[in-house]
Design a protein with these regions (language model features):
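Short, solvent-exposed, charged loop/turn and helix-capping segments
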Residues: 94-111
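N-terminal intrinsically disordered, cationic/polar leader segments
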Residues: 2-77, 113-144, 150-170, 174
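Alpha-helical scaffold segments in carbohydrate-active enzymes
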Residues: 83-90, 94, 123, 143-146, ...
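Alpha-helical segments in soluble extracytoplasmic regions
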Residues: 66, 70-95
Length: 176
């Protein structure tokens, strides 16, 4: 084996690399797998709505006189807030992946409102993390649903809204 030039196999592979132009990879995981779906963003937005419902249903903290009830209330509140924040950030992450890796200039030409929808999702996702605001949570879900409808339209699929059958209520956008 010639150390300077490598094995015949490695020389052959280098030659192939020089003769063929590499293709560009386009996918959220950069493999490319080509798998994109706004469903997870919708479920995460429903979770943000549900956590707001649970926080509102929790009511006011009990007085310091009953340690067990007070501890249980604070435990529940901490868990609801943590899950609300985690899922609001998950909405933003999933939308950023599709926005950055899937959508192309031709999609934006056809759906110029997409910029505003994504911007709204980012702002509402932050607001949902920072506050207990049912309206912000509902608005986040509505914007994610608009995003999902445009996403499926770019794939040539019509959409339908179906009851979510989740405890948060509302609907989920599915490709028809």
């Amino acid at each position: 084996m010639n150390v300077r030039f490598g094995s015949p196999l490695s020389r052959g592979l280098r030659l192939l690399d020089r003769l063929s132009e590499p293709a560009t990879a386009h996918a959220h995981c950069d493999i490319p797998c080509g798998i994109y779906d706004p469903h997870l963003a919708q479920i995460a937005a429903h979770t943000v709505v549900r956590m707001n419902q649970l926080i509102n249903d929790l009511g006011d903290a009990p007085g310091p006189g009953d340690k067990q009830k007070n501890d249980a209330w604070h435990n529940s509140m901490a868990r609801y807030v943590a899950v609300k924040e985690e899922h609001a950030e998950l909405v933003k992450k999933e939308v950023r992946i599709i926005w950055g890796d899937y959508f192309k200039p031709e999609h934006l030409e056809k759906y110029p409102e997409l910029h505003t929808i994504v911007w709204n999702i980012m702002k509402l996702g932050s607001k949902a993390r920072q506050t207990v605001d049912m309206q912000a949570a509902q608005d986040l879900l509505a914007e994610v649903q608009k995003f999902a409808e445009i996403f499926w339209a770019t794939k040539g699929a019509s959409t339908q809204r179906q009851p979510s059958r989740q405890t948060s209520g509302g609907e989920i956008v599915y490709p028809a």
